[in-house]
C-alpha cells in the first residue's frame, strides 16, 4: 500500500527526519492560505498522486507569487495527471502539496528495502540523487552503497556514519545523516514498511540535509496491526478492480493484455502468464484465487476479470492438491452459469480427480474448453482470442 508524499513527510516529522514545511490542500482557498502560513516564497507546489515522473508532466512547479499557487491548484485539483508510470488515464489529483522552496546544493539518494536474498532490511545510498535508482544500478552500480541491519541488534549509529562517509559527507552532515538513518530505520521497522525512498535527500546551500521527497510503501500483509496507516489509504489512487479484489482476499493485478488469467497459487500464476506470452498472447491480469478455489471465490474472480472490457478470453489454470479437481470443475461451471460469461473459457485442471473434473466440464454444455496440458491451454486460449 502506497502513501502520498505529504503523508510520508508527516511520518518523517514524527521520527525526527528533517523535511520542508508544507501543507496538503484540497481546495483553492487552502492552497492560498498555506502560502501565508509558510511565509515568504518562493514555494513549491506538487500534485499528490501515487506515481513518479510528476515533474516532467507539469505536476511539480516552483512559484514566486500566490497567484501562481492558485493557478496551479485550478489547473490540477479534480483533474488527472498522466506520467510515464501511469496508464493513459492517469491518476486523480485530489490534493496538492504546498511547501517552502529549498536551496539545493547537491542531491543524494537514500532508500530502505527488504532484501529477500540476505533476509535483511537493507539501506541503499548514492550520490546520484534525483534520478531513478534503477538507472544508477544498471549503469553505475559502484555508486550505490548498502548497509544491512542485523535483526538482533537493530540499526546502529555507526552504520549511519559509515554511509555518510561513503557519500562524502563531513562535519555536521555526518551527525545529521546518522540521525536520519536511525529515524528512518525505526520508522521502517515500527510501521511494517516494505519500501522507503528519499529521492532526493538534498544538501542545502547552508550545508544541511533535508528530505525533499518521500515515498513510502507499507506491507499489505501487516496492515491489520497498523490502523493509522490503514486510515491513510487513498482508494482513488488504486485500480478499482484491484481494490475490490483486495476486499475479497483475492490477489489481482491489472495488466494491458486481453487474456484473463485465473490461477490458484502465485508461482503458478506467474508461470501461466509466461506461457501465454510464449505462445503469442498478452495476459490481461495476474489473479491468484489462493488455495481455496471455491465456487464463491471463482465466481467473484470471474466478475473481476470480466469487468475489464479488454478481456477476449479467460484461461483458468488450477492445480488440485488437497482440493479435488471435480469440485473445482463444479465451481467453475456454476460460476460461468451465474456470471453469464460470453467469452471463451479455457480450463486446465491437473492433480486430484483431474480427469473427472475435465469430464464434468465437457458434459456441462457451456462454452468451456477443457485443455489437456498447460501448453495446450495456452495455445487454445491464444487461438480463441485470434478467432481461430
UniProtKB/Swiss-Prot annotation:
Keyword Mitochondrion: no
InterPro entries: ATP-grasp, ATP-grasp_succ-CoA_synth-type, ATP_grasp_subdomain_1, Succ-CoA_synthase_bsu_CS, SUCC_ACL_C, Succ_CoA_ligase-like_bsu, Succinyl-CoA_synth-like
Binding site for Mg(2+): 199, 213
SUPFAM superfamilies the record matches: Glutathione synthetase ATP-binding domain-like, Succinyl-CoA synthetase domains
Catalysed reaction, written as an equation: succinate + ATP + CoA = succinyl-CoA + ADP + phosphate; GTP + succinate + CoA = succinyl-CoA + GDP + phosphate
GO molecular function: ATP binding; magnesium ion binding; succinate-CoA ligase (ADP-forming) activity; succinate-CoA ligase (GDP-forming) activity
Pathway: Carbohydrate metabolism; tricarboxylic acid cycle; succinate from succinyl-CoA (ligase route): step 1/1
Keywords: ATP-binding, Ligase, Magnesium, Metal-binding, Nucleotide-binding, Tricarboxylic acid cycle
Source organism, top-level taxon: Bacteria
Domain ATP-grasp: start-end pairs: 9-244
Cofactor(s) the protein needs: Mg(2+)
EC nos: 6.2.1.5
GO terms, biological process: succinyl-CoA metabolic process; tricarboxylic acid cycle
Residues the record lists as binding substrate: 264, 321-323
Binding note for cofactor: Binds 1 Mg(2+) ion per subunit.
Binding of ATP, residues: 46, 53-55, 99, 102, 107
Keyword flag NAD: no
Family: Belongs to the succinate/malate CoA ligase beta subunit family.
HAMAP family: Succ_CoA_beta
Function statement: Succinyl-CoA synthetase functions in the citric acid cycle (TCA), coupling the hydrolysis of succinyl-CoA to the synthesis of either ATP or GTP and thus represents the only step of substrate-level phosphorylation in the TCA. The beta subunit provides nucleotide specificity of the enzyme and binds the substrate succinate, while the binding sites for coenzyme A and phosphate are found in the alpha subunit.
Assembly, per entry: Heterotetramer of two alpha and two beta subunits.
NCBIfam families per record: PRK00696.1, sucCoAbeta
PANTHER family hit by this protein: SUCCINATE--COA LIGASE [GDP-FORMING] SUBUNIT BETA, MITOCHONDRIAL, SUCCINYL-COA SYNTHETASE BETA CHAIN
Protein name: Succinate--CoA ligase [ADP-forming] subunit beta
